[in-house]
C-alpha cells in the first residue's frame, strides 16, 4: 500500500494517472488486441461485436458515463458505510479482498484519502454467502441510504452499452441439442461447459472514471479496476467478450491441432462410459424450424454470462473443449501463471464429468432420453419454499407426484 500511496502523491493525487502508470495486469495491457481483432475479422465475426470488444479491451468501459454529484451526496454514502454482512464477517471479507488484491483487480489506499480524491464516489458493499459456494463480494450500486441520495447505477444507463443476449442462451443450447440429435440419431452426444475465472474483472474501467466505483472497507479505500458485480453496466460490457469467444470457439472447433496444446488439462476430465449395446437413443423429429445440423463436426457454443455451454460426439468432444479454451486465451490473454491467473476456471473444470447427462445452468439435461428436469436439490428447495407460501398446501400435490 505504501507503494501506491507514494505513487499517488507523486502524481498529485490523480487516480487516472496512477492507473496508467501501473499498466500491466492493472489495465490488461498484456493482451494482444490487434491480433485478436485480426483473427475475428478473418473468421467473419460480426463487426459490431469486434468494435465493442476493441473499445472494452483498449479504452475501457462504460461506453458512456456523464454525471455529476454533490458533496452532500458523497457524505450520505460515506457515513452509511457497508451492509451488515460485511461488518459481521470481517475475516471472510478480508480473505476475499486479499484475493482481489493478489490478482491486481484493485488498488488499496488509506481510507482518509477519500475526502481528497477527484471524481470519487463510495458504494456500500455486501457479502453473499451460499452453501457449497465461494463467498462473493457484492458492489451494491443501486442502494441509496436515503431518498435524497443518488447511487452510481442511477447515473448510468443500459442504452449506451452493448446489447445483452445471454437471456436466450439456454433456449439456443437446447435447440442445438435437438438439431444435433436429428443429425446423429444413433450416436452419443456428450455435454460439457467451462467458466471464465473472475469474468467481470477482465473488462477494465476507463481510468478517468475508475474512482467513481470505489468503496471503503475497514481502514482501506479500494479503487476497482475491473467490472464490479452489482453495476448495471458490467454484464453488458462482458457480452462482447462472451460473444467473440463463442464465435472464435466455433471457428476453432474445425481444427484438430489444438488438443495437443491443452491435453494436459482436458485429459484430467472424467468422461462417462460409452453406451452399452442395448442403449436406446430417443429420436428427434425434423420440422420446418429444426432440420438438423449442416456439419456435425463444427461445435456451437452458447455463453450464459461467463459459462460456455457446448456438446459434441465422443470422437469430437475433446477437440471442442480445446477450441473453447483457445478462444478464451485469444480474447483475454494466454496464461502466465508467474504474473497472473489463468482466465479459465480450472477448479470448476475438473469438479464434474463430461457426460450425456449433466447439470447445466441448474437444469439436468439428458441427451439419451432428450429430457430436461429440475435437479433434486432445486425441486426439494422449491417444495420447501411452497410449503411456507400456501397454508393449505394444495399446490404441492403436483410437484410431489
For the regions a language model picked out, list residue spans one by one.
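Reverse-transcribing Pol proteins
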Residues: 1-162
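Hydrophobic side chains in beta-strands
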Residues: 65, 127-128, 139, 217, ...
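Conserved aromatic-histidine-acidic binding/catalytic patches
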Residues: 81-88, 226-237, 296, 300, ...
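Residues that flank catalytic or metal-binding motifs in active/ligand-binding sites
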Residues: 121, 211, 304, 359-361
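Short acidic catalytic loops
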Residues: 138-141, 191-195, 296-312
